[in-house]
């Protein structure tokens, strides 16, 4: 994790490489058609804690919280705590401190065709370690769930590096397609969520 954080902070301009092919070696849980209760049980069985809450589920802000986010991020949970009713099509998961989700995105807009988040990590030589859970996102990216080792501080990063290339990779106008969703500071769309576009 420290190497990854340093890589993002210390990026230097380099020539543009060929985009990486889609990874074959990642076995990922498909996000659609999952029962929320089963996902919560799986996270709990892995020792994860955090808060599950409803997302708006419609329009341009479909992934935005439908409730106040701060309590979901800051309220300690001793288990996977579900703050939802039974009919929300989209839910968010805010991991507790000590956990994080690495969000490897697919570049969009002006960055389309450039290496995706997984390709950036492969090209950097940092690697992905051994995530507890890998989820394929609705857009084709990945969410990698990790327990943060004691004493390691992971920064919360959301497409940091707009117009700043990483070593050996092209510049990204919309930011490097990697986010960290750190416990107590961020959240992800939970597997089982039904996006408005399917």
PLM features: what roles do these ranges have?
Residues 1-198:
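Conserved phosphate/metal-binding and DNA-contacting active-site motifs used
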């Amino acid at each position: 994790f420290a190497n990854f954080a340093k890589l993002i902070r210390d990026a230097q301009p380099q020539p543009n490489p060929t985009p990486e092919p889609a990874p074959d070696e990642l076995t990922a849980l498909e996000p659609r058609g999952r029962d929320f209760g089963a996902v919560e049980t799986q996270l709990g069985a892995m020792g994860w804690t955090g808060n599950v809450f409803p997302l708006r589920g419609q329009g341009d802000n479909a992934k935005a919280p439908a409730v106040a986010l701060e309590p979901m991020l800051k309220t300690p949970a001793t288990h996977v705590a579900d703050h939802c009713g039974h009919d929300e099509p989209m839910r968010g998961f805010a991991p507790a401190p000590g956990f994080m989700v690495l969000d490897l995105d697919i570049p969009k807009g002006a960055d389309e065709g450039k290496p995706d988040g997984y390709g950036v990590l492969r090209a950097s030589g940092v690697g992905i370690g051994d995530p507890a859970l890998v989820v394929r996102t609705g857009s084709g990216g990945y969410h990698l769930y990790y327990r943060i080792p004691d004493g390691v501080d992971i920064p919360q990063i959301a497409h940091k590096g707009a117009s700043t290339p990483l070593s050996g990779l092209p510049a990204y106008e919309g930011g490097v397609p990697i986010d960290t969703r750190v416990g107590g500071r961020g959240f992800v769309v939970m597997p089982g969520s039904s996006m408005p576009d399917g």
